[in-house]
């Protein structure tokens, strides 16, 4: 089953609208990725509009963390998800998205990338 992102076809009163056109492929969406913390990296590259590509990250165990003081990027192992402003239930399920605070080997970091869209977890070290 796909997600349709076009007009609903209903009037505000509940009656049916006259259909102006058929459903088009560009009006389709997809389910949210919900990148999870796992033991290995699972990623898939999909075709998007205009022939472009998008990398979807399903599971990850490492993150590219930027250290502000040293001004260096380190690839470190993610231990757990600490806090998620998008949804508090994502913490229990270890789901990582943009803005999530993760616990890593070198300290806590905030995720700056969109793992479901970019295919990688980039983060910035918190003090």
Swiss-Prot record:
Pfam families given in the database record: Ribosomal_S8e (PF01201)
The alphabetical list of record keywords is: Ribonucleoprotein, Ribosomal protein
> Which InterPro entries does this UniProt record tie to the protein?
Ribosomal_eS8, Ribosomal_eS8_CS, Ribosomal_protein_eS8_arc, Ribosomal_Se8/biogenesis_NSA2
Q: Where is this region: Disordered?
A: 1-25
Q: Name one GO cellular component term.
A: ribosome
Q: Name any Gene Ontology BP term.
A: translation
Q: Name one GO molecular function term.
A: structural constituent of ribosome
PROSITE patterns in the record, alphabetically? Answer: RIBOSOMAL_S8E
How it assembles, according to the record, is:
Part of the 30S ribosomal subunit.
Family (UniProt): Belongs to the eukaryotic ribosomal protein eS8 family.
Write the protein's name.
Answer: Small ribosomal subunit protein eS8
Q: Which organism is it from?
A: Thermoplasma volcanium (strain ATCC 51530 / DSM 4299 / JCM 9571 / NBRC 15438 / GSS1)
